[in-house]
Amino acid sequence: MKHIRNFSIIAHIDHGKSTLSDRLIQVCGGLSDREMDAQVLDSMDLERERGITIKAQSVTLEYKAKNGETYQLNFIDTPGHVDFSYEVSRSLAACEGALLVVDAGQGVEAQTLANCYTALDMNLDVVPILNKIDLPQADPERVAAEIEDIVGIDAMNAVRCSAKTGVGIDEVLEVIVEQIPPPEGDPEAPLQALIIDSWFDSYLGVVSLVRIKNGVLKKGDKFKVMSTGQNHTADRVGIFTPKQTDKTELKTGEVGFVIAGIKEIHGAPVGDTLTLAKHGAEKPLPGFKKVKPQVYAGVFPISTDEYENFRDALNKLSLNDASLFFEPESSSALGFGFRIGYLGLLHMEIIQERLEREYDLDLITTAPTVVYEVLLTSGETVYVDNPADLPAINNIEEMREPIVEANILVPKEYLGNVITLCIEKRGTQVNMVYHGNQVAVTYHLPMAEVVMDFFDRLKSTSRGYASLEYNFIRFDPADMVRLDILINGDRVDALAMIIHRSNIRHRGLALVEKMKELIPRQMFDIAIQAAVGSQIIARSTVKALRKDVTAKCYGGDVSRKKKLLNKQKEGKKRMKQVGNVEVPQEAFLAVLKLNE
């Protein structure tokens, strides 16, 4: 056991985590040169295309250290994006140490800090590593000082390496062996294994990634899942080297996979504990805190017969992505679908893309909303995440919107732009600290403003240098109203949105204009209105198509033309009473794009 090292790699987006993992795998000979390709752990197509890590992946390597001993290194590559921070905290729970990778050109960023604090809270040893020293703009001295100043860990003797060129990789491995403590645990005690991750394989059933805290799990053992109390037999156990490699047993302190032919999807929930069916452990390990979704959106299959497939797909995906929340929802405009809760907009985009790609579905999403706390006149408090469920205005005593605390790190030359943006988003400044060239600003912002397009705007006003990390703190009273869109006097539930009263004129006008472009002309006039309660605040009309009925009249009396025109008018009037308007898919998507 004293030769096992479990560690994670944490860093901000694009500081080189995945490339560093590639080098470690190569140096330790986990894969032959033929099988090696760039970012070998980012196995999802989506991860490769966007160049980001979404799922944490684990690898076990053998490393022969300079002192002649052979060590088993289990490491987990984690995502750097703020929406996936729960993936990071899960990975950290399985480790004794973490490598904090910092780009020697960019320096410390908000996400580096957030993940590093998570690691320190879990009492892990954090080892700083300066990456990308081959770049011309690299300045390791300044960055090391920055790490000490902002993060507060000793970084003067931090290893300097370049994952791309392979310089300093051996030193990184030595540091891992020297500075990260071996796992603690009792091989004789009853088995306790923490499920770090699980995914569904159509041939093998549920595959779970586990970290053995105490005891040993052998192939063929009968084990039980502590939260459900169900018993299963371990058909295969093993490790990833990154290839799936079978072993006869997983010992204390190791990280590996278990396949038990569990067919029902929630058979082994993430964060659960496995123990042996006979002589099992008394109590489960402390799991992870359940992540609360921050953003909700209705998602509907374009053709209704795909509803069942959509439900299966969501079930399979939620096994792999523990933070996904969904419940059935129906809409008069879009039929049956699900209300899905996400951690943020990137998460929402990724989930939708994964559903469309991996499960071949055609989906349409309504505008995302956050959860509001509503105090009713009857004195009870309800939580609303769907604009259609908002009680009538006269029943509402007070609306409260969620407020987040946003920590922004920005170079001082862009500070002005960032402050302007935060004020425009109804933020209040709480704190500002200068660290050398960087400024750390803390703002309290309404979550609704943050989830919409705050991140993109922040990046564009600061040329990509500002970085953001936020978490929910409380609900604050706010003057929020529901904006409805009426088409020919009928409310379209899928287009409703909850916004701040100061934005309704501007938003309502923009919306009806956009809808006017997108709804095709019919044989009769279509009135598109934006309303708050019974008050109409904006309107536009899609003009009717009409046949030129007077074309056959040459000369003659004007009453002849009038007769024909009036006859046409009567017909249009009758048509309007019975006519239905089809709202095209693009119109729903336009609502999402409005803020661009």
From Swiss-Prot:
Amino acids binding GTP: 14-19, 131-134
Q: Does the keyword Signal apply?
A: no
| One GO cellular component term | plasma membrane
Q: Which GO terms describe its biological process?
A: positive regulation of translation
User: What protein family does this chain belong to?
Assistant: Belongs to the TRAFAC class translation factor GTPase superfamily. Classic translation factor GTPase family. LepA subfamily.
Role, per record:
Required for accurate and efficient protein synthesis under certain stress conditions. May act as a fidelity factor of the translation reaction, by catalyzing a one-codon backward translocation of tRNAs on improperly translocated ribosomes. Back-translocation proceeds from a post-translocation (POST) complex to a pre-translocation (PRE) complex, thus giving elongation factor G a second chance to translocate the tRNAs correctly. Binds to ribosomes in a GTP-dependent manner.
Query: Under which name does UniProt file this protein?
Result: Elongation factor 4
Protein's organism: Shewanella sp. (strain MR-4)
Q: What is the lineage of its organism?
A: Bacteria, Pseudomonadati, Pseudomonadota, Gammaproteobacteria, Alteromonadales
Gene symbol of the encoding locus: lepA
